[in-house]
Amino acid sequence: MEATQKKNKYEIDMCNGTIMDKLISFALPLMVSSILQLLFNAVDIIVVGRFTGSQALAAVGSTTALINMFVNLFIGVSLGANVLSARFYAAGKEREMSETVHTAMTFALISGIVMVFVGLFCTRGALELMDTPADVIDQAALYMKIYFCSMPFFMLYNYGAAILRAVGDTKRPLLFLIISGAINAVLNLFLVIAFSMGVAGGAIATVISQVISCVLVLWCLFTTDSCYRLQISKLGIKGEYLLQIFQVGVPAGIQSVVINFSNVLLQSSVNSFGSIAMAGYTAANNIFGFLFVSVNSITQACMSFTSQNYGAGKKKRMDRVLIDCMILSVIVAVTLGGSANLFGPQLLHIYTTDADVIACGTEILLYTTLTYFLCGIMDLIPGALRGMGHSAVPMILSIIGTVGTRIFWIYGVFPTHRSLMVLFLSYPASWLATILLQAICFYFVRKKVHSTMPQEEPL
């Protein structure tokens, strides 16, 4: 085993000392970073909704689930790069760390280029399959085609940020997103309002901001003196490391794609209520997204901390990481979910002034935000399992619990009780079902993993 890398001022020691304060130090910048990244889309929606109209708002919002379904397989693979990098870094395996970084970044570039072509040639047909109304489909297709031109930069940023998270650095990605997010907001106001470019202006602003955040993360990787330094001459795919990345990342990506497919089905059900409900769901879903990225940052922390401690052979610390993450996740979800429900109409007014749209959005928030702590718990368990290198079974159980429940609900319950309330109660029902399945899986996987690890001193 090679000497462990000396940590720079941006990195967090995940394997020693108290856990909760380090979790917060890791998760808070990641949470703010994720919120800023979500604001890229939120600014598009707010500016387009306020200055272009409800149809344009519905057009932009109707693309969210579809975009996520297309890109999340590749983003899931970045989780594999994160887990593998964290494990090698904690174990002091510098050569393996370098090979992982260069393989991951090469794959990111290739997948981004592939997604450009997917976006250009598949978006219209996909929107038609979703029964997107005729009055919004042209604008939705235009937005998606422009947005997908940013995919190479989007992928490189996300894979680069995953590598930085693996070594405990969440502060610099936050700084980069503050810069690119501010530019995105200014460009939205400039292109949509001053130049009256509508949804195209919002999409172009997002593309430019993605380019900027990508360049900044690449600069960070190119200039570091650590073992994760990126060098153009070393770019290439090493099958051994890509396979290990895929073993964790592909199941996570497939899970995300399939879950987003269930969200596409849900979007199709919302579409059946008309453009007012679509606009209300767009605004509510954007607020809902802020809850997701907040608790998901804790899941990311759980995965990185678990992976590093697994690499360092500290199984008791792995247990403590999951417990502390659950406590933190419930606190965050209850606080933010309650606030989103309490101030729902005021928050929705940021997106639109249409009273009917606000009423629909408020109703949707009521059914999704108050139980969101269940979603946080549901995601933490497979996050810990992935940190231990187990991803396939959690994927299968998540698909059965989440997607299976939602499909049953959409096609079995919703048709006989057609209302927004019944439709959106599919969320907490699917979260509960998945928690039960994942908890059983965790018990057996933890027992197996711990039996293969050496005895250690008490924490």
Residue ranges, per PLM feature:
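Residue-level signal for short hydrophobic patches within transmembrane helices
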Residues: N16, M20-L39, V43, L66-L73, ...
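Short runs within selected transmembrane alpha-helices of multi-pass transporters and secretion channels
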Residues: S78, Y147-R165, P173-G181, G202-V215, ...
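Transmembrane helical elements of multi-pass membrane transporters/channels
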Residues: S25-D44, I146, S180, S209-S213, ...
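Small-residue-rich hydrophobic transmembrane alpha-helices
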Residues: L57-F117, F154-P173, G280-G338, L342-G344, ...
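Short alpha-helical transmembrane segments in multi-pass integral membrane proteins
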Residues: M1-A27, S85-S150, A194-V250, T306-T371, ...
